Amino acid sequence: MKITKAEVEHVALLARLELTEQEAETFTGQMDAILAYVDKLNELDTDGIVPTAHAVPMENAFRADEVTPSIGIENALGNAPKRAESFFRVPKVIE
């Protein structure tokens, strides 16, 4: 599958990216190489191969829940530029 510069520019537009002419040319070549590799992978015979998500079998690798001491309010807020009582003070985002 060959990708065109117009397709790269369209994807950039959808991603709200502003590309220079040089970047569009570079990405066209890079994406074309990636898609050529994917085409090569699609040619492989995978009949009889069990799909896997991990190279080694894994099941629910949970750790034990343990209560540990926290760092404390003074340490947590020590480098905060602004604070209000025991909270971080941040600029208002929603009017």
Curated annotation (Swiss-Prot):
GO molecular function: asparaginyl-tRNA synthase (glutamine-hydrolyzing) activity; ATP binding; glutaminyl-tRNA synthase (glutamine-hydrolyzing) activity
InterPro entries per the UniProt record, alphabetical: Asp/Glu-ADT_sf_sub_c, GatC
Entry keyword set: ATP-binding, Ligase, Nucleotide-binding, Protein biosynthesis
GO biological process: glutaminyl-tRNAGln biosynthesis via transamidation; regulation of translational fidelity; translation
Enzyme Commission code(s) on record: 6.3.5.-
Keyword Ligase (UniProt): yes
Reactions it catalyzes: L-glutamyl-tRNA(Gln) + L-glutamine + ATP + H2O = L-glutaminyl-tRNA(Gln) + L-glutamate + ADP + phosphate + H(+); L-aspartyl-tRNA(Asn) + L-glutamine + ATP + H2O = L-asparaginyl-tRNA(Asn) + L-glutamate + ADP + phosphate + 2 H(+)
SUPFAM superfamilies according to UniProt: Glu-tRNAGln amidotransferase C subunit (SSF141000)
Job of this protein: Allows the formation of correctly charged Asn-tRNA(Asn) or Gln-tRNA(Gln) through the transamidation of misacylated Asp-tRNA(Asn) or Glu-tRNA(Gln) in organisms which lack either or both of asparaginyl-tRNA or glutaminyl-tRNA synthetases. The reaction takes place in the presence of glutamine and ATP through an activated phospho-Asp-tRNA(Asn) or phospho-Glu-tRNA(Gln).
Family statement drawn from the similarity comment of this UniProt entry: Belongs to the GatC family.
HAMAP family: GatC
Subunit structure: Heterotrimer of A, B and C subunits.
UniProt protein name: Aspartyl/glutamyl-tRNA(Asn/Gln) amidotransferase subunit C
The species this protein was found in: Geotalea uraniireducens (strain Rf4) (Geobacter uraniireducens)
Protein's gene: gatC
